[in-house]
Amino acid sequence: MPVPPPPAPPPPPTFALANTEKPTLNKTEQAGRNALLSDISKGKKLKKTVTNDRSAPILDKPKGAGASAGGYGGGGGGGGGGGGGGGGSGGNFGGGGPPGLGGLFQAGMPKLRSTANRDNDSGGSRPPILPPGGRATSAKPFSPPSGPGRFPAPSPGHRSGPPEPPRNRMPPPRPDVGSKPDSLPPPVPNTPRPVPSSLHNRGSPAGLGAPRPPFPGNRGAAFGAGSARQNPSGSSSPFPRPPLPPTPSRALDDKPPPPPPPVGNRPSMHREAVPPPPSQTSKPPVPSTPRPGLGSQAPPPPPPPSRPGPPPLPPASNDEIPRLPQRNLSLTSSAPPLPSPGRSGPLPPPPSERPPPPVRDPPGRSGPLPPPPPINRNGSTARALPATPQLPSRSGMDSPRSGPRPPLPPDRPGAGAPPPPPPSTSVRNGFQDSSCEDEWESRFYFHPISDLPPPEPYVPTTKTYPSKLARNESRSGSNRRERGAPPLPPIPR
């Protein structure tokens, strides 16, 4: 009867399953437990075998790792040296560390020897794999003395063999680099190479061969003598920069002579509005460019001083830096009435009656106006991008320009007659408020104040609030006792 007591713990599930089958379940459980014990014992043995099997692939993996290290090539030399150091440390572990790790490694020792034999067999077939065979050297301390006597000779030979080709591989690009400094300054050749490849796709494929001379030739033809001078300077940055400085410095003269690169860069600047470089470099010319435009189109010089008054203008204009010169060009080249009717078309009817619609119109303007790109982009961006406070400032800018234009002045003085930026918006709001009051007064009838009864005079008196009384009672502790009682029972629980 000693067996039933152990099944005593499991019977509750057996009771839940079936009450009558307890003895049979006990027998099966006994057999199952015996089988489990035997399986557990076998499992331990199997685990030992599994450890041996695992140790074998782990020991084989260094070969695979060695092969992969061999595949790394240039790093194989340093890896081989590191492997040699690891081999020495491995020898130390093999000699002094068997008590700690010896159980696993000693079990795998014969397989290490077999792998060493495999290396002997396949040593000729795997010459490149052996250089990282530095790990074979790491296995050498484990292998018998005869093994290391055999391996060290071939392994150093193999080490010396394969690391040389990676070195040979490494230097050939360096002579290419050396050839690059012949045509370009030595420190920069690597950097300017990618930059021209990004700027000109032709240069990247042709860069390796002799066509390097036409490469600077093309740049010299594109960028001019100044850029040719900057090319020998050898800084990668001047390649993107040369088009930028001539544009602000020479203004509009450079556009016709170097058509391909600067024009390609400028449309990208106009469309992409490349903010970081052009804005920084051209921030000073921005005020200069619009002011000459104003001087050329509108004789009165006062607008520029009024313009610097509102600070938000320069940042907004920075986004449109390249577009401002286009506006001048387009206004000078194309007939001025084009922008005037385009802008005055929607405006004249509403301004006097509806101050809000001019605020709503700019998106409408931006919608219909885009087809004539330069003027309308400037107008749309000038009105859509900047906030409402900038609109009056731009209207102030346009007012001198539109001085000769009859329709515009009546439109914008309505909104721009008051002092320029903030008061104009506030005045617009005032117009809106007044118009709303007019609408309400026209719609509804309001009693005069005289018809309304006078309010009761204010008399300072102490007032009592029942809610405060209840709070005072709760503070007194009457409610605290009631509230304090329930939390106490859960505490003893």
UniProtKB/Swiss-Prot annotation:
Comp. bias regions, Pro residues: 1-14, 142-155, 162-175, 183-195, 239-248, 274-290, 298-315, 336-361, 403-424
Annotated positions of the Asymmetric dimethylarginine modification: R33
Any one of the GO BP annotations: actin filament-based movement
Ranges where the record places region Binds actin: 45-48
Misc note: Recruited to PIP5K-induced vesicle surfaces in the absence of functional WASL.
Keyword line: Actin-binding, Cell projection, Cytoplasm, Cytoplasmic vesicle, Cytoskeleton, Methylation, Phosphoprotein, Repeat
Any one GO molecular function term: cytoskeletal anchor activity
Region called Disordered, residue ranges: 1-493
PROSITE patterns named among the record's database cross-references: WH2
Protein name listed in UniProt: WAS/WASL-interacting protein family member 1
Lineage: Eukaryota, Metazoa, Chordata, Craniata, Vertebrata
Family the entry assigns: Belongs to the verprolin family.
GO cellular component terms listed in the entry, alphabetical order: actin cytoskeleton; actin filament; cytoplasmic vesicle; ruffle
Pfam family, one: WH2
Composition-biased stretches (Gly residues): 67-105
Subcellular location: Cytoplasmic vesicle; Cytoplasm, Cytoskeleton; Cell projection, Ruffle
Coiled coil, from the record: none
Organism: Mus musculus (Mouse)
Start and stop residues of the XRSGPXPPXP motif repeats: 342-351, 364-373, 400-409
Protein function: Plays a role in the reorganization of the actin cytoskeleton. Contributes with NCK1 and GRB2 in the recruitment and activation of WASL. May participate in regulating the subcellular localization of WASL, resulting in the disassembly of stress fibers in favor of filopodia formation. Plays a role in the formation of cell ruffles.
Domain WH2 residues, every copy: 32-49
Chain intervals with Basic and acidic residues compositional bias: 470-484
